[in-house]
C-alpha cells in the first residue's frame, strides 16, 4: 500500500452529454492494431503534489506530447492555466476538475507555456493568477499555438487503443483506492477483494501491453515504475477522451470521428437560415 497519501477526488465524475463527439460505428472493429503499442514521444513526469489538479496535469502532458521531440524553451506547458481558469471559463468552483472542461479549454485557448502561468496552486488561490494571465494578449496568442482540433469520447478499451494508435495519448480517469500499489512489473494491484475507493483520478494513457494499459501518472518519478504504471485489463477506466491535434487529422473522407447529432442538426439549421437571409439580401439589392 502507498505510504504517501496523494490527493484523491481531483477528477470529478461527468454525466453523458449529447454534444460529445465519438468514434463512428464499425471503425474500431475494422482497425488492425498491434498486440502492444507505446506512443513514441516521451515527456517528463509531472508532480501535482497535494493539489487536486490531476486533470490539468494529464491534459498539459498530452499537449506536450503533441510538440514532438523538438527541443524548445516553450515545451513545458502550464497546469495552473488549465486548472485556474475553470471558474471563469466553465463556472466550476471547488477542488478538482472535469475531463470535459480541460478538453474544452485546450480546444478554445490551448495552453500557456509554464513561464506565462507558473505554479501549481489549489483553488481558490489559483484563480487570480490564471485569470490575470488570460487577460494578457501576448500570452493568450502564444497559448493558441497549443490548441487542439477536437476531442471525443472513448467508450471501450478497443476505442482507447484506436485513439492512442491514431491520435496519441488519451486523457482518462479511474476510481482510485489507497489499497492500490504497483508491483515489480509495473502493474497496478490491490490485495483487497472489494477495495474502498476514495475518489476519481486522471492520468495520461500512452499505450498498452499484453497486461493492460500503460499510463503516466502525475505523482513524480519516484512513484510507481518511474512515474508510470500498467492498468490491468481486469480494471477499467471510468471515462476517457481521445485528443485530435491539428497535425494528426485524417482526411475528411476517412474521418473516423462522428459529429454529435445536435451539432449536425444545428449546422443544417444555420445553413438554412443563412440561405434565407442571403435570399432576402439579394432581393433587396435588385430593387
What are these regions (language model features)?
Residues 1-37:
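N-terminal zymogen propeptides
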Residues 2-9, 32, 50, 56, ...:
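Predominantly the structural core of cysteine protease catalytic domains
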Residues 20, 25, 148, 190, ...:
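Positively charged, low-complexity intrinsically disordered regions
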Residues 36-50:
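Asp/Glu-centered strand-loop micro-motifs enriched in Gly/Pro and often flanked by an aromatic residue
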Residues 85:
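Acidic/histidine-rich, surface-exposed loop or edge segments in extracytoplasmic proteins
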Residues 259-287:
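Short, low-complexity, charged amphipathic interaction modules
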Amino acid at each position: 500500500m502507498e505510504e504517501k497519501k496523494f490527493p484523491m477526488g481531483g477528477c470529478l465524475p461527468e454525466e453523458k452529454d449529447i454534444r460529445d463527439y465519438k468514434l463512428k460505428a464499425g471503425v474500431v472493429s475494422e482497425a488492425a492494431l498491434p498486440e502492444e503499442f507505446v506512443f513514441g514521444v516521451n515527456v517528463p513526469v509531472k508532480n501535482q503534489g497535494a493539489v487536486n489538479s490531476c486533470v490539468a496535469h494529464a491534459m498539459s502532458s498530452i499537449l506536450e506530447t503533441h510538440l514532438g521531440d523538438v527541443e524548445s524553451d516553450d515545451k513545458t506547458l502550464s497546469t495552473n492555466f488549465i486548472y485556474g481558469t475553470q471558474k471563469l471559463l466553465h463556472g466550476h468552483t471547488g477542488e478538482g476538475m472535469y475531463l470535459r472542461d480541460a478538453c474544452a479549454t485546450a480546444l478554445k485557448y490551448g495552453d500557456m507555456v509554464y513561464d506565462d502561468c507558473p505554479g501549481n496552486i489549489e483553488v481558490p488561490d489559483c484563480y487570480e493568477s490564471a485569470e490575470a494571465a488570460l487577460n494578457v494578449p501576448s500570452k493568450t496568442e502564444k497559448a493558441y499555438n497549443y490548441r487542439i482540433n477536437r476531442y471525443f469520447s472513448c467508450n471501450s478499451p478497443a476505442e482507447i487503443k484506436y485513439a492512442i494508435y491514431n491520435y496519441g495519448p488519451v486523457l482518462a480517469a479511474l476510481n482510485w483506492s489507497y489499497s492500490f500499489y504497483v508491483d515489480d512489473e509495473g502493474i497496478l494491484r490491490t490485495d483487497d477483494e472489494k477495495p474502498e475507493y476514495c475518489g476519481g483520478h486522471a492520468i495520461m494513457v500512452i499505450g498498452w501491453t499484453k497486461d493492460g494499459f500503460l499510463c503516466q501518472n502525475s505523482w513524480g518519478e519516484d512513484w510507481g515504475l518511474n512515474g508510470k504504471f500498467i492498468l490491468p485489463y481486469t480494471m477499467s477506466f471510468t471515462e476517457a477522451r481521445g485528443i485530435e491535434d491539428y497535425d494528426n487529422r485524417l482526411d475528411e473522407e476517412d474521418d473516423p470521428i462522428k459529429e454529435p447529432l445536435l451539432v449536425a442538426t444545428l449546422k443544417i439549421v444555420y445553413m438554412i437560415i443563412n440561405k434565407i437571409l442571403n435570399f432576402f439580401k439579394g432581393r433587396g439589392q435588385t430593387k
